Amino acid sequence: MAAPLETVMTPCQRFDGRNGASATPKSLAFSIERIMAKTSEPKAAAFQPSQGLDPGAKKMLNLCSPLPCMIPIQSLAYDVHSKALLNYSELWKSSLRGSVCSPSGLCKSNCGICCKNDLNMGHTVLPGSRVIKPQVINQTVGLPTNGSLYYFNYLDSSFHPPEILSGQLLSSSLINAQSQATLSAQQKLFLLENAKLSGLAPEKFPNPQYPHKERLPGQLDQVMKENSALSADRSGKIHSKLGANSAEGKPKIFTCEVCGKVFNAHYNLTRHMPVHTGARPFVCKVCGKGFRQASTLCRHKIIHTQEKPHKCNQCGKAFNRSSTLNTHIRIHAGYKPFVCEFCGKGFHQKGNYKNHKLTHSGEKQYKCTICNKAFHQIYNLTFHMHTHNDKKPFTCGTCGKGFCRNFDLKKHVRKLHDNVSSSCSLKEISRTGQS
């Protein structure tokens, strides 16, 4: 790149048509060494927009005049593609949502968008503007062979000269050509998108020379969709997730007609209805037990596998699931996080806490159709129905008494047979000691 640059940036020579001799070369405003050196950039002059600027005319600048734009000279050896060649969606979204760059020109972090952290902070910046480092674009279509480098100045402000809005070049050009260079579609889009940072719509672009929606319909349509969505998000017009389903932004409420319980989705109400209907469509093929939900049946199947990989380190008791082990550990720790607000009784499990609260409410909505006995929960009514059907699947091995629930059987053994077995064992020990 150095060799072609030297041919372009040769000292200015003025050709005198009268005598055919070249005049004495003037001193350059800046030298090649100054451009190539990695030093602090010079201060830029303030950009004064002209009132009567013709959009169709492109101002060509030669190297013998100072640059009238507010960008510093970018070192040609610097890799600007890592910072300047950004995806438009990232660049535009950062500007709309509010980037980390302050309006005063002090960049709090090297954000990679405005690159102010690498610039000299002494530059004159327009009020409400944001200086982006000049972008070097390799242009190969429709350009002369003596150079292919352009410097662009993008101003993220409310004022954009027509040259940017029409997709033409602004600031300095290193090509000594009188015909306007043709930009590629991608580079036009890059120019137009940077102009959109100020919130201009495509229909506000004054020059109809570049029908962007015909050239790049998919990209620009996506840009406008993101523009409208993010603008609405910034102004607070987008509803929350709960309010997105309704026109007024209020969450939909599905109420159970039997118990009055409220749900935020119809699916949850459908899952709740088998509680009142008593339907248990998911039946275990091993024991025949029915469940209202398929997930409960899957958890139940672990019981029949006889696998208990989760063991308690203190008592050695094993469990099918880790959640059951965690609840069991609360017993050893004496931790009862669920406390009744009426009587102050604590519970290890939340289910036992809820069942206990029903005793204080006095509501027994589940009644037996045979004896009219009422219960707090439906599973108590289910076990009560076994008394009328004479079904007692749980039998005591000592006395042969039958029970409807395994819990009642364990309670029976603990109260009656555990004391008897312990007294019998003490008598046998005393007899062996006397003999």
Swiss-Prot record:
- Gene Ontology molecular-function annotations: DNA binding; zinc ion binding
Q: Does the keyword Zinc apply?
A: yes
The alphabetized list of GO BP terms reads: cell differentiation; nervous system development
State where the C2H2-type zinc fingers lie. 254-276, 282-304, 310-332, 338-360, 366-388, 394-417
- Name a single GO cellular component: nucleus
Q: Read off the SMART domains from this record.
A: ZnF_C2H2
The record, for Pfam families, names:
zf-C2H2 (PF00096), zf-C2H2_6 (PF13912)
Q: Which InterPro entries match?
A: Znf_C2H2_sf (IPR036236), Znf_C2H2_type (IPR013087)
* Statement: the UniProt record of this protein carries the keyword Transcription regulation: yes
Q: What is this protein called?
A: Fez family zinc finger protein 2
Which organism is this entry from? Xenopus tropicalis
Q: What gene name does this entry carry? A: fezf2
